Each structure stands twice: as C-alpha cells, then as structure tokens.
Curated annotation (Swiss-Prot):
It comes from the Eukaryota. Gene3D superfamilies: Cysteine proteinases (3.90.70.10). Its EC number is 3.4.19.12. This is Ubiquitin carboxyl-terminal hydrolase 11. One of its GO terms (molecular function) is cysteine-type deubiquitinase activity. The active site is at C307 (nucleophile), H649 (proton acceptor).
Length: 717
C-alpha cells in the first residue's frame, strides 16, 4: 500500500480526531506503566498485522502507538517523575524509530503532537494552575551564622532576571551558541601542572585514541521480581585487600605526577562466622599534599562525542552514597551473577572506572571499559560517535544498575525500603498499602532505590460531589518544566525565575474542567438508553476506531485507559457539562530520597529547540513533605549544557569536598570539561562573595544531597 504525503497527513489527523482527541485529557492522568504497556501492545499489533498483510490495520496501530510515545506519555502526569520505567520508554521509542519504512509517518505524528501540545497549553479555559501550597524554598529556617553569610558559585549571567512565573514557557530555537569549538576542550599545555595554577590541563591529543568496540548486542533483560519473603541473612564476609599492586585495569591513563599511585587487587571474599557488622572500606590513597590526588580530582578524556557521559560520570562519582557502593565492593552482595554474567555487568564496569578515578587524582583517563560495556548493552546509542541527552543516559544507567542489583538481600541492608507508616506519611492507608506492595513486587528492590527513589501522591478531587481518587508513583529524577513570566500575578520586575518556582509549579493545584476534568465515577450518569445508543453508534464508527477498540480490548492493561469516557453518550456529556464538572488535581511529596536529582526540561520534541531561560538555584534547598516535615538539601553538583542537543556540549561542576560541605573556606568546587579541569578558589570567580544561590541559562541537571538536622548545625555553626 502506497500513500502520498498528503494522504498520510490526512490519515494521521483522522486517527487523532477519532481515536485520541476525546481520550487525551483522561489518558494524561493514567498510570505510566499502563500507558507504556499499551504502546508496546500496539507495536506488537503493528508487527502482527504486517505479517498477515493487513497494511491499513498495521499503519493505524503504528500511528496510534506514535501518539502514545510523542503526545500522551510525555504529557502524562507520571512522566515528570522519572524512574526505571524511563528506560523502558527509551527502548520502546527506539523500537518505533527503527521501523525505517515508517520514518515519515513517525515524523508526521511527532510534528502533529507538537502542534497539539501548543494548542492545548494555549487554551486557558480548561486548565488553571495555582500555587496555594509552596513546597520548596531556599532560605534556611533560621538566620545564617555570620561566617555562613558568604556562599556562592561563579555566576556567568550578569543581565537582569525575570519575575516569578506561574505558567509553562515554550522553548525557542536559539542558535547563538551552536558553534562550539571542540579544540577548546583538549590540550592547552603539555602534561604538567604548574604549582598554584587554577586550571589543570590533562593529556595530549595524541592520547585520545578511539577505542575499538565490541559488536555483541544483548536482548532486553527483565526486571527482578519476587513474591517470596527475603531469605535469612548470609554470614558476614571480610575483604582482604592487597595494596601497592599495580592496577591491571583496561582503562588507560596519562600521568601528571611522578608519584606512583598505590594500586588495589581484586579482593578475596571469605566467609567467617561473626556477629560483627560488615565493614566496607574505601581503597587507600597514598598520603599526599596534592589536592588533586587527595580529593580524587580526575579528568575523563573524550574520544569523540562522550561529553554527555563524562559529565554524568563526574556527578555520579561525586555522589558519596553511589560511589562508595562500588568502591567498597558492597555492590557484589546484591549482584545476580547467574542472570548477569561478567560479560554484561555494567556494575562491574562502574566499579573499575570509579576505582581508577579514585586512585588517579591529578590524571586523566579514558573510560574504555565503561564505554565498551555501554556500547554492548545499548548499541542504539551509537557510542562514542553520536551525541545523546545526558539525563536520559543517567536514567539508562540507574535502571540497568537497578536490574543487576535487585536482590532479596537488599532488604537486610536497606530495611527502609520495605517499612513505612501510612499514618505518619498522611496518605490514604488502604490505597497506599495496595500500591506499595504491588510496586515493590513488580519493580524489585535495589540499592538504587535507597539512594534515589522518592514517592509522590496525586489526588483528583471532584468539586461537585467531593469524591477523591488517590494514586502514587516513584521517581529517580524529577523532570521539571521551566515556567514563563507572569505579567499579571507579580509586579516586581526584580523577582527571579527560581528552581523553587519550578518545584512549586510542579506541585501546584491544577483545576481541570470540561473535557479535561476527571471522569468521576460518582458523577457519571448511568442512563441505560444512552448506553444502548452509544453501543449502537460505536458499531457505525470507522474501521480505524474499531481497530483501536479491538487493540485496546486485547491489551492486558486496557483497564488503565479510557473505559470511563467510552460510557458517556453525547446526551450525557451535555448534562455533565451543564453541571460544570470540575476537578482539582493536587500533588505532594510523601517521601524524598537521600539524593535528589532534578532535571530542567529545556528541550522540546525535536530536540533542536532549547529553552535558554535563566534559572536561579540555591546552595540550600528546603522541600516540605505532605505531613509538614521539612527536608533540607545541599547542592553538590550540576550538569550544564551549551548549544543545542545536536550541536552542543556538556560540562559538570562538582563540590569535591569529601562531605560536600559548603561553609566558609570549606567548599571545593571544580568544573569538569572532559579532561580540562578548573578548580575555583575563594579569591577568584566570587565563589564566596556573599551569595547563597547561582544563576545560569545552561544548568540542566542538578544534584542535591539530603542534610540531617545535626549535620546542618555542625556544618554551619
């Protein structure tokens, strides 16, 4: 079957009008897992119908699936709270994109989705979002001590900032920063480090050898699932570490120092009978007055287009909980070696890379083994040749590590993952317990959950009858839309677009009315005659809608979708609209993780348009849970992006102070630009010039570490 471009466009628009439009608002409120499962089901239907030469049916299934991928799922509520499901979304999107014969169809659906979203956001009658409960603020609960009054990071932006927003802003296509000079990221001096120099340069261009990658590809690995109780605790082990042995890692390094680093051999694990708690010690770094060596400030060379990988690796290495999980070899307690042999263990590659970075401060290395493993596990990323999105890569890594380390032993070391007090959290006990047990069984448990997993509660409350619907979700990364200026809510032009505003907008109450309102079951009019008329009218619908109904009914997850809306006849819809059906959607944090990762959504659908709005973000961030408890975080790392995704560059900034302290004369902020490193000092770049926040139009991903109240008092007093 051959269709010209006009025919394809007309078909895509017809499918939207018949099969998507009337359900779009309701689908945005549905469970993300159900939406992903249905999109995968539609892809399987597409493949099946191709085999039996039902070309129109196959084309229709593909179009509907593309609408799920580019319209429904990205605009769904739970998509902003990204967890290990995001990796499934990325793989599914790759499956659709690999159907090259359907490339033009996919592009048309993607372009139409962009138009639909623009139109949807422009309609103010159906959606009204208000910030009644501010969940985030940057100022401490008490005045700062005198010596704490000077905190800042170099601010590259000197222009005037904006007013506080209350709406979303759409990215624009800014090409002013597209011309990135790649040579600036390479050598600027020989392999030496001058004493007292603020900038450290690593390696020579000759050392940037392009690794040879393996061609092996692995299939999709299922997540760990368990229905049984955890086994009893295993005997405690001890690790015998031999030091002063030359490392045999495959990663290559270039030295900046004449001092030979101590190396560590793969430790032997022996079972012993002891009731003492297991001690997991870090490798030993030789005593040195060199700050680069002491704090493991290590550069990562860029063989081609891996700056997005290098930047995330530096932030992960700067995440103490994550880094020490590998450096102490504790990760081995949870690694399922039967399911994941050494040849496909991303965990082991991270361990080798982190050990190399930890013991080689003052040098730069090429992370060959890690890149090879990523290439093997995800050949679609085309590492190292293609530029990718850094936060997507982060989620891919976290999801893979979660799979490899999902193990029954996890609960013995992280009991917080299976213990909760619904009353203390102030959640709906029955709804939360049901969701929690189902979520744990489905996704398994891993140390990644302990480090990164947060929980959200979403409530839909009908304003006509008072009925409420509760749903819960987890996240590893908070993906926040960037607000736009409000010219009518605030008059002070000195107010800034702050990170706190993005969070407060995310948790702000949203009023849904008309077609956008929640289909409240208590308010649904059950008129038998209308139902009969609806059944009759459905039989007369086009074959396209009939196909979509069949594909939906055959999906094992069809109950997640629009069966509420399909019960309403035109007559019922008029009655409901006459009564002004209105819903208030509210969102609350109920559990926040030790490490809070925030992604600012700067890119649009085609990934070439970028929102370059200046965002101000604090060194200390306070977030209020639903139960009123304040969780305090301190910033320790950011990933910044210049240019656009196709022609751009990633760098990272990390506080390399061992405890991420940010008091006077304590913080050690370092900028990592591949193998080019800049250490910021207090007498340069205004690092401690009296500010407690930073502003940037390039900040993209932020890493915050939770502070205990005791540590807060010790650090700043």
């Amino acid at each position: 079957m051959l269709l010209n471009p006009d025919q394809i466009l007309n078909l895509v628009r017809k499918v939207y009008e018949v099969d998507i439009k009337q359900f779009y608002s309701q689908l945005r409120l549905k469970n993300l897992r159900g939406l992903l499962d249905h999109a995968a089901h539609l892809f399987n239907v597409y493949l099946r119908d191709l085999e039996i030469n039902q070309e129109m049916e196959a084309l229709t299934a593909f179009i509907i699936g593309c609408y799920y991928l580019y319209l429904i799922i990205p605009q769904s509520l739970q998509f902003q709270t990204r967890n290990n499901l995001y990796s499934s979304y990325a793989k599914l999107k790759n499956d659709y994109q690999d159907e090259h014969v359907m490339g033009y169809v996919l592009k048309v659906v993607r372009d139409e989705s962009t138009v639909i979203v623009d139109r949807y956001l422009a309609e103010s009658n159906g959606i009204c979002r208000t910030i009644k409960r501010k969940r985030a603020y940057s100022l401490p609960l008490r005045p700062l001590p005198v010596h704490m009054a000077s905190l800042s990071i170099h601010n590259k932006f000197d222009g005037s900032l904006h007013e506080i927003p209350n709406e979303l802003t759409k990215p624009t296509n800014d090409n002013s920063k597209e011309d990135i000079v790649r040579e600036s990221n390479q050598i600027a001096s020989s392999n030496k480090l001058e004493a007292g120099s603020e900038v450290a340069y690593y390696t020579s261009k000759e050392a940037l050898s392009k690794p040879s990658y393996l061609k092996l590809s692995t299939g999709k690995d299922a997540l760990f699932k368990t229905l049984s109780s955890p086994a009893t605790a295993p005997p405690v082990h001890s690790l015998e570490v031999s030091s002063q042995i030359r490392d045999s890692s495959q990663d290559s390094s270039s030295s900046l120092s004449k001092v030979e680093k101590p190396k560590e051999e793969e430790g032997k694990i022996e079972a012993i009978e002891s009731s003492a708690p297991k001690a997991y010690n870090l490798p030993v770094i030789e005593d040195s007055n060199d700050l680069l060596s002491e704090l493991s400030i290590t550069g990562l060379q860029n063989p081609c287009n891996t700056c997005y990988i290098n930047s995330i690796i530096q932030c992960l290495f700067g995440t103490t909980l994550f880094r020490d999980l590998f450096l102490t070899k504790k990760y081995r307690l949870f690694l399922n070696t039967n399911k994941y042999p050494k040849e496909v263990q991303l965990s082991r590659s991270i361990y080798v890379l982190f050990k190399k970075m930890y013991l080689n401060g003052g040098r730069a290395i090429i992370p060959n083994r890690f890149l090879k493993m990523c290439k093997k596990l995800r050949p679609d990323l085309n590492i190292p040749d293609d530029q990718q999105d850094t936060q997507e890569f982060l989620l891919i890594v976290l999801a893979r590590i979660h799979e490899e380390l999902s193990n029954e032993n996890v609960v013995k070391y992280y009991p917080d993952l299976v213990s909760y007090d619904a009353n203390a959290l102030q959640v709906n006990p029955s709804k939360y317990e049901k969701w929690y047990e189902r979520n744990v069984i489905t996704d398994g448990l891993s140390p990644i959950d302990h480090i990164y997993r947060g929980q959200l509660e979403n409530i839909l409350k009908c304003q006509r009858c008072g009925n409420s619907s509760y749903s819960y979700s987890t996240f590893y990364v908070l993906s926040l839309a960037i607000p736009k200026l409000s010219l009518y809510s605030f008059t002070s032009k000195s107010r800034k677009i702050k990170l706190e505003d993005c969070i407060n907008l995310f948790t702000g109450d949203e009023e849904l009315s008309g077609d956008n309102a929640w289909d409240c079951p208590n308010c649904r009019i059950t008129d038998s005659k209308s139902k009969k008329e609806e059944i009759t009218s459905q039989k007369k619908k086009s074959t396209i809608f009939g196909f979509h109904s069949r594909s939906r009914s055959k999906s094992p997850h069809h109950h997640h979708h629009h069966h509420h809306s399909s019960d309403d006849s035109t007559k019922n819809a008029k009655k409901r609209n006459s009564k002004k059906l209105t819903t208030i959607k509210s969102l609350d944090f109920i559990v926040l993780p030790p490490i809070l990762v925030i992604h600012l959504s700067r890119f649009y659908y085609d990934l070439t348009k970028k929102n370059s709005t200046v965002i101000t973000y604090p060194l200390i961030l306070n977030i209020i849970l639903k139960n009123g408890k304040v969780i305090r975080y301190k910033l320790y790392g950011t990933v910044n992006h210049s240019g656009n995704l196709i022609n751009g560059h990633y760098t990272s900034v990390v506080n390399k102070e061992k405890s991420h302290e940010i008091g006077l004369n304590r913080q050690v902020w370092v900028t990592f630009d591949d193998d080019y490193i800049q250490q910021h000092r207090k007498d340069r770049n205004n690092f401690e010039a009296g500010k407690t926040e930073m502003s940037s139009d390039e900040v993209y991903v932020l890493f915050y570490e939770r502070m205990d109240e005791e540590n807060y008092e010790e650090e700043f007093c």
